[in-house]
């Protein structure tokens, strides 16, 4: 008996040793990949090395799920002829910027031509100058208008969201889209497989049975694990008949109407656009759809890019970014805006975990006399992200930055307003995930009236916010300091 136990222990030791050796070899291979084969910041490299060293049995699994970088092999493809047409528009606009020769040009477009040129050159974010915009800060108003626009559609509806919940609002929207599909309108839904995991096939069955088409972005090929869970499509885009576009922070679900007991009122920012900027949203949707669709690819014909008579005069660039891009375009757009500030900066972001260079740009602006105001949530939806956000925002207090906690529910708005002149609204948070890992889209707006309206929305929010002063921050408990420290350490991989 003792001899049998001895043999069993010996074999179990051999198995355990084999597991540890195998994990060590895998971690070593992944460490080599992280250091030499991938483009990462030094902070990200060190964070992943710490994970591999201190979690030897699970580090490589975490890396497979959360750390792998996507291959930059043109996920989003456009045929040669259409690419030539897009390049022609970009070249013409670059020449016009150089000569300051823009039709309907306004003061902001001339003043910020370097920023426009940067987004044009590296992101093909062509400038449109004939737009009319409506700003939403309340979910009920936004979805009321969206449903009405869906009901008025006559040709097609292209509908893309990170999250579509299988709840009352989600089913209402899907039902309205299904009705249009039954009427012969082309209706296509693109949803993120991770963000909309509550929807999946069963929730879409009635919509599909009515003739609608739906595709998941980066769907999982395994039942419980998505190996691309780290690269999600966070974009929210709607295009209706090529005439109306929506972009911003609201997802689709009851909680975005303020019906969540956990979060309460949901404060976000979204845009309704009429004008040629809708063509840019359409292009982004087609690229995303065609990259995932197994059938029903969308062509680039004139039907999807009609002339729009908006009567508007607002300048807009639609910029997108993602792990497939060489440059972090939305981040660069934010940085260019911040560096151009002379009077004021207003930032709203639920997740504020930028890199040190980004934080330094804000400090430089504040130390140079710019009035810098940042608003973040006062309740967490992701604990580690919340504590890292708090620590980053508080690190700016000594430079004179004013930081506010939004107390009236949950703040999910992603806005940046500079000097009452230009603004950005979209899906990108001010963190590593939005800048580098996720697929995002933002509208960069060159218009004083829109900038002033967005600034006023921030000021209105101050009535239900509390300032995070240095004295108040200094009183936080040791437990909060500990959570901040751990979250800050993990921030490069959050």
From Swiss-Prot:
<keyword id="KW-0677">Repeat</keyword>
<feature type="active site">
    <location>
        <position position="414"/>
    </location>
</feature>
<keyword id="KW-0444">Lipid biosynthesis</keyword>
<keyword id="KW-0472">Membrane</keyword>
<keyword id="KW-0812">Transmembrane</keyword>
<dbReference type="InterPro" id="IPR030874">
    <property type="entry name" value="Cardiolipin_synth_Firmi"/>
</dbReference>
<feature type="active site">
    <location>
        <position position="236"/>
    </location>
</feature>
<feature type="domain" description="PLD phosphodiesterase 2">
    <location>
        <begin position="407"/>
        <end position="434"/>
    </location>
</feature>
<comment type="similarity">
    <text>Belongs to the phospholipase D family. Cardiolipin synthase subfamily.</text>
</comment>
<keyword id="KW-1003">Cell membrane</keyword>
<protein>
    <recommendedName>
        <fullName>Cardiolipin synthase</fullName>
        <ecNumber>2.7.8.-</ecNumber>
    </recommendedName>
</protein>
<keyword id="KW-1133">Transmembrane helix</keyword>
<feature type="active site">
    <location>
        <position position="241"/>
    </location>
</feature>
<feature type="transmembrane region" description="Helical">
    <location>
        <begin position="14"/>
        <end position="34"/>
    </location>
</feature>
<feature type="active site">
    <location>
        <position position="419"/>
    </location>
</feature>
<dbReference type="GO" id="GO:0008808">
    <property type="term" value="F:cardiolipin synthase activity"/>
</dbReference>
<feature type="active site">
    <location>
        <position position="234"/>
    </location>
</feature>
<dbReference type="InterPro" id="IPR022924">
    <property type="entry name" value="Cardiolipin_synthase"/>
</dbReference>
<keyword id="KW-0443">Lipid metabolism</keyword>
<dbReference type="Pfam" id="PF13091">
    <property type="entry name" value="PLDc_2"/>
</dbReference>
<comment type="function">
    <text>Catalyzes the reversible phosphatidyl group transfer from one phosphatidylglycerol molecule to another to form cardiolipin (CL) (diphosphatidylglycerol) and glycerol.</text>
</comment>
<dbReference type="GO" id="GO:0005886">
    <property type="term" value="C:plasma membrane"/>
</dbReference>
<keyword id="KW-1208">Phospholipid metabolism</keyword>
<feature type="transmembrane region" description="Helical">
    <location>
        <begin position="45"/>
        <end position="65"/>
    </location>
</feature>
<dbReference type="GO" id="GO:0032049">
    <property type="term" value="P:cardiolipin biosynthetic process"/>
</dbReference>
<dbReference type="InterPro" id="IPR027379">
    <property type="entry name" value="CLS_N"/>
</dbReference>
<dbReference type="InterPro" id="IPR025202">
    <property type="entry name" value="PLD-like_dom"/>
</dbReference>
<dbReference type="Pfam" id="PF13396">
    <property type="entry name" value="PLDc_N"/>
</dbReference>
<feature type="domain" description="PLD phosphodiesterase 1">
    <location>
        <begin position="229"/>
        <end position="256"/>
    </location>
</feature>
<keyword id="KW-0808">Transferase</keyword>
<dbReference type="InterPro" id="IPR001736">
    <property type="entry name" value="PLipase_D/transphosphatidylase"/>
</dbReference>
<keyword id="KW-0594">Phospholipid biosynthesis</keyword>
<feature type="active site">
    <location>
        <position position="412"/>
    </location>
</feature>
